[in-house]
From Swiss-Prot:
Main location: cytoplasm
Protein name according to UniProt: NACHT domain- and WD repeat-containing protein 1
Function noted in UniProt: May play a role in the control of androgen receptor (AR) protein steady-state levels.
Places the protein is found: Cytoplasm, Cytosol
Keywords associated with the record: ATP-binding, Cytoplasm, Nucleotide-binding, Repeat, WD repeat
Gene: NWD1
Amino acid sequence: MQRGKPCRALPTLKCQTFCQRHGLMFEVVDLRWGIRNIEATDHLTTELCLEEVDRCWKTSIGPAFVALIGDQYGPCLIPSRIDEKEWEVLRDHLTARPSDLELVARYFQRDENAFPPTYVLQAPGTGEACEPEEATLTSVLRSGAQEARRLGLITQEQWQHYHRSVIEWEIERSLLSSEDREQGATVFLREIQDLHKHILEDCALRMVDRLADGCLDADAQNLLSSLKSHITDMHPGVLKTHRLPWSRDLVNPKNKTHACYLKELGEQFVVRANHQVLTRLRELDTAGQELAWLYQEIRHHLWQSSEVIQTFCGRQELLARLGQQLRHDDSKQHTPLVLFGPPGIGKTALMCKLAEQMPRLLGHKTVTVLRLLGTSQMSSDARGLLKSICFQVCLAYGLPLPPAQVLDAHTRVVQFFHTLLHTVSCRNFESLVLLLDAMDDLDSVRHARRVPWLPLNCPPRVHLILSACSGALGVLDTLQRVLLDPEAYWEVKPLSGNQGQQMIQLLLAAARRTLSPVHTDLLWASLPECGNPGRLRLAFEEARKWASFTVPVPLATTAEEATHQLCTRLEQTHGQLLVAHVLGYIVSSRHGLSEAELKDVLSLDDEVLQDVYRDWTPPSKELLRFPPLLWVRLRRDLGYYLARRPVDGFTLLAIAHRQLVEVVRERYLSGSERAKRHGVLADFFSGTWSQGTKKLITLPLVGKPLNLDRKVAPQPLWFSHTVANLRKLKELPYHLLHSGRLEELKQEVLGSMSWISCRGISGGIEDLLDDFDLCAPHLDSPEVGLVREALQLCRPAVELRGMERSLLYTELLARLHFFATSHPALVGQLCQQAQSWFQLCAHPVLVPLGGFLQPPGGPLRATLSGCHKGITAMAWGVEEKLLVIGTQDGIMAVWDMEEQHVIHMLTGHTGEVRCVKIFAKGTLANSASKDYTLHLWNLLSGQEKFTIWDGGSKNPAEPQIWNLHVDEAHKVVYSASGSKINAWNLETAEPVFHILGDASDPWMCMAVLASQATLLTVSRDGVVSLWSSATGKLQGKQHMSSIKEETPTCAVSVQKQGKLVTGFSNGSISLVSSKGDRLLEKLPDAVRFLVVSEDESLLAAGFGRSVRIFLADSRGFRRFMAMDLEHEDMVETAVFGTENNLIITGSLDALIQVWSLSEQGTLLDILEGVGAPVSLLARGGALVASASPQSSSFKVWDLSDAHRSRVPAPFLDRTGLTAVSHNGSYVYFPKIGDKNKVTIWDLAEGEEQDSLDTSSEIRCLEVAEQRKLLFTGLVSGVVLVFPLNSRQDVICIPPPEARKAINCMSLSKCEDRLAIAYDNIVLVLDITSGDPCPVIDGPRYTFYTQLPETLSSVAILTDYRVVYSMTNGDLFLYECATSKAFPLETHRSRVACVEVSHKEQLVVSGSEDALLCLWDLQARKWKFEMSYTSSYCRGVQCACFSKDDKYVYVGLKDRSILVWSVLDGTLLTVQFVHAVVNRIIPTTSGFIAPTRHGYLIRENFQCLSAKASPQDPLKNFKKAMWMVKSRQREELVAAAGAPQDLESESAQGNETKSNKCSQVCLIV
């Protein structure tokens, strides 16, 4: 076949596509393509081809070798090297022929630097006529070898070196040398029928071997026949034979037979290669490769380590001292060790040797984990590093692997890592040693101010050893800022002169080389007293190439000069431009380049191609490629300086040495050259010139532009539905950014929903955010910031429900749609792309029609979570940049809120952390815990300064308080717990005094009044005690005069007034001082908390569902506002704003409310907490953090612009009593602060339009959309009806009994009936048309439930049937016309909603235990029952039927919406909307729904296929189970008393399959 065609023909492209779909990279290696014939058959090319064969077998998991054998045996080359003994045998036989001996001696020179000495073939001099002499030389050597073989002086294998062709050498190396290579090899044999009859014809001679005189080479033909027979005998399974009839123009491409043969050959190649790939993949799947990535990572570092320590020498004293230190530290807590020294000093070799000797140093059961950082993808960043270490340690110790919830967030992985180390320590058995070499090569450390994941103290039996470079890189300085113990740092010093010489000798011996005395002197003259192993290795790499008969160039004296010398040598050998571009591309890549990628990139580089084809033209007129042989030659000379790193399942090339990277940047990537390299890489990874797109080039010998196909690999985002193009995802943004193609970056990456979804699904939300963090600082684009913040807001949904397309598209569209018009360039395009995707989505999906999730630019800055239990304490540190949290399981975490990650894990406590106090300008923290210890921490370093046993009472029945006060002036910390008060010196941790109280009357409140040097306590019985804060001596004791028979519940000190404000169980607030006490206020309920502003001018008291504000005055405090700040649930905590113009309050219903004090208590915003009672609020500047003991998550809000109007402004409803009119234009809800009024909110304008006075508190709201009526149900029992077109008018419906509060109301679907439900009474009224407004008549019917339980929900039908439910779960159908009540099957808990279908044949009911039932009203039995179980489920909130009654839309209290098929009970889709939906109102193709966040959801439900699988949207749900039960149709028909007319029911759209089994969908 024509050379070059197989490697780039259509079949290989098909194989490439096939492999990409399976996550594999397909690389064709044909080193003889694109080069001149003289180079194709030289000795170096042959050697490189054989090396490539070995590389293919080592690398490939599928096809590794393909041979195309025709009727040519090929040329036989003479050996390029002859061993000394073999040379002597040949010389002895040539002694009788002096001219032959002289010829051989002229071409071969003895290299005594080889071991053993070798005779090396010399290239002919310039201008010499070498071909005749070479032919003679070949004949002479072959005859000498033949004679030596006949006499038995050389072996058959040695003889073959003179008689084998290049083809046979390659087949021997790849196939015949082993019996187990059938799986990856294929040999195509071409046999031409009757060729022997035409063998002497001129046209046939082109197909066979010829001698120099043009005659047939019979010996070559015999050897070819022997080779074919050998292949057939050893590996018949790899053979594919093609028999062609003889033809004079057989090899003419226009010959149909020839074309058919080529097509068949290509098809066979594709089938064979694909089969080999699939076979191997099945074997890997069978072997269980879930943790293949981990095993590959471990093997990589072990292999690297074994390579490094082969030439290790010296350091024995340092190893011994390190071993002694490890044994000394093994039984106690200690700091990590850091080995440091200049680059190249031998730190890596020492770390690898230490890992090898660890079993001897600490015992044979020691678990050792070694990572050579930066040599693989997972060891290049902290996220991958910690993940791999955690998995390896868990497997080694038999511990559970990190769950998916931990792996979803890097902060959780960090905390899991710290916890894992302590778990291993507590086993008290095997020691664990973690060795992390080259901290400088860890991306997250290189430019960081700290190392947030680094344990500052190692527990017993856990050791952490790091290495770092000293010098200008700064990583060692970073470590020294966090690891303060000077004993932790161990300097690695240079080798001695003797050790340096020993190292060189070891390297030479490993390479089977030596140095002559002259060369040895030259080497050491260039390296006087050099003990730097890196510099020695550079010298060795040069010296190993010295032959004994050459005079080498003197070596450079410094490492930098040696690296420049290396580049100069490479340029002289391979050309300056090629070396500059190859090294430039490798260094410019983000993670490295595979060999296939590098060859593709070079094929796109016009400068390189013009330089390569300066003296000859490429072999093809259709395509243009870079000749791969040129790269392989350069790769061989790079050798030791080239590293291979496993990344995403591929092997990537990178520069192994920092010094060479710096030199490459200096020599080849200065100025515009850097942007050019990134530009070509961007072209490659974007696929600009792939898939047949041709690129113009002008070659020197052609002189005109050529438009040629470069045949580079295509670069789609997805290779298949499940395999993403990870290389493109990771490299393209980086190269677009650094090539200056910023608009393309914004359009193709940051502004592409396809890119965002692919990156998010394949790499997770953190990788996606990393891309935006990489690019955003270089882009002056507010739109990029909006998208980045929107992605950050998506994190809770992704962590809760898993990353998948519909979730990501919904999240971004519902958050960014608000800005689509104002920011059309990027945000508008993203929204359009999302809408287009939804239109084509094949699965059932809810399609957002507008924004309804919290948009970027709002107050929420972050939602963060940790790998710990609920949060019990919280405080801000240095300049409001650090947030310290304490948890139920005793963990203290210090968060950097600028970078939003944990910087320290403080693990001293064993019990729940109850209090944290920050002082010393935010740099120190005191913490108190249920374990009765106090800890003092340095927040900057994360170090524990001391621990104090506080000696609290262990009596669980005794009331416990945890109160800390830090007196910085006197350097004393006071703690109160139970009946004991302690004072400790902050510097020495020595006790200052102890005060013991009366166990029968324990203290409930304690304060240190610094201005009076007094310590004040209030006991349970109201006894006030005064103590000296300096000595602890009692100064006085008295009973409170202002309080009788109340127990203290909370207190806060007011230092300026010298008073303790104390709250009591019956609502009293008292001011207590050393002079006595005074009643400040009597509240209606028990005081739940007291807080004062920073300047102590304001006081807030929480009681029941309200907060009252007081203003400081001369007597203490007075009431600040006439109105109280009200919540819908019990208030839990509060905090004042920076300038006392705000107060932020939190309540039991997980809501946070922001009030303006400068506007007399105006509610500015309602914020959603973490889904649990808001028990903790902490302010740091303009930032407010909220948390709860019931959640491991916390939120951080920026309230600096709380007074600024937000666009769009959400409606502020906290009751959930919302109604909607005018197709979602207006929302109605009880007015904030005055529930006797209805607020009318204009959604388009984002403001209140009007309000309606109801004169009584509102209990429920309903809107008759068609009749334009608003119904308000009141606590008084009255229903007021407001015509929406004339709101000044009102219709009053009186209650049946005085003061009976309304529970709920319902309108029939035609809006002609109204049902009003009280505790146990239901009124049914008629609504008829009238002028100017509808007329409400009745009540037409009134009935009593006659049950002890109260009504919870009601639904009315046009025919006067009523479906109602009770608080205990009972459900009834009542026929008003006959006064009959029919009990339906009971729910297991309170029914939250009952809704009737539009055709009034079905009813859906939902209960608080998340059980939904679909009822057939005619049969009065449920058709389908669906239950939902999850760790987040809190029951059903609301439901409705679609307009066509095909679906049921359900809002759950876990802040999600589901769609349920009425036809067969199938769960179609679930959507997480971040907020509880108050009600759902159907529209023509979907629904609208107001949420507790103040937004109106507008969505269409799209189900393109009637048989669409409902499984796909649910596959990523975590810890959730749906179960659907269906009742057999015959049972329903029998219950209804109707004939089983299947067609009639089918016409109603209610057909269901008989014998339908229960459906169970388990979502893990």
